[in-house]
Amino acid sequence: MNPPDPVVAKLQALVRIPTVSTPDPADLDTAAFDALLDALRAQFPRVFADLAATRVLDHGLLLHWPGTSADRPVVLMAHLDVVPVDTSAPWQHPPFGGDVVDGAVWGRGTLDDKGSVAAICEAVERLLADGFVPAQDVWLSFGADEEVSGRCAPAAVEALRGRGVRPWFVLDEGGAVAHDAFPGVDRPLAV
């Protein structure tokens, strides 16, 4: 059996950490979220060495990657939390196993949304290694309570606003609202 692709192994490691969100922050397993933040730092060392990181509330992250210009900042969003496991139905594979079966990683967060976190961080890690500097400032915004419509995303917005950042483009879970992106379209457009 071949060892997994390094990127797959990184996602598996994130999936294996049960960062289950709860409506009441007092019920949160903070050790799991601390472990996930530690895993991100270990797996993506350039990201955390080269980008200015700010904690948002307790477990959210805002990372700034300066570009050659700051006039049209880009925000790439994802979230670190997952929904609780429904134990009323049997699972094909353990929800926090991160098993690779038929070429797919199985587990909580693979699609919603640790897969996005891993993909964003891996892309930035590789671009940093290549010495790439983006044309515009790029902000990575990783929330920790999206599944319960928590406080992290609004706090990240306020943190950006406090820095005078007005995003030109925001990508969250695969879609975006674009401004002035298409000829003849003069209003924001969800794509």
Residue positions per predicted region:
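Acidic/histidine-rich catalytic neighborhood of metal-dependent amide-processing enzymes
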Residues: 111-191
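Acidic/His- and Gly-rich active-site-bordering loop/insert found
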Residues: 1-110, 130-134
